[in-house]
Amino acid sequence: MTVALMWEARAVDGRGEQLLAWAREQDLAQEPLRRETFRAPGDRVLVITWWDTAYDAELPELPEPDGELVRRSVHRWRFESVTAG
């Protein structure tokens, strides 16, 4: 099964590039199948990692950035792939 972990944070105004750089620098304890980093208006950064594992498996996640860098807590979601029926 493929599991996708999504990590999304919103930077303090004007610090989106710093948050993006911070997210890119973070190493995970295990290497995912795939990792992509995105940015969006409003100084938001999204990181998605894909894993070949069970939905409830323990997986490494990006930590919370320094409170001076973000305006709110990180949002995290876990999804599993489904096949078209």
Regions found by a protein language model. Give the residues of each.
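Glycine-rich beta-strand-turn "strand-cap" elements at beta-sheet edges
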Residues: 1, 33-46, 62-85
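A beta-strand edge to alpha-helix "cap/lid" segment located at domain peripheries
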Residues: 21-25, 52-64, 79-84
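Short glycine-/aliphatic-rich beta-strand segments at the starts of folded cytosolic domains
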Residues: 2-11
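Short amphipathic alpha-helical segments
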Residues: 11-34, 62-65
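Helix N-cap motif at beta-to-alpha junctions
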Residues: 12-15, 50-56
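Hydrophobic pocket/interface hotspot
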Residues: 7, 19, 23, 35, ...
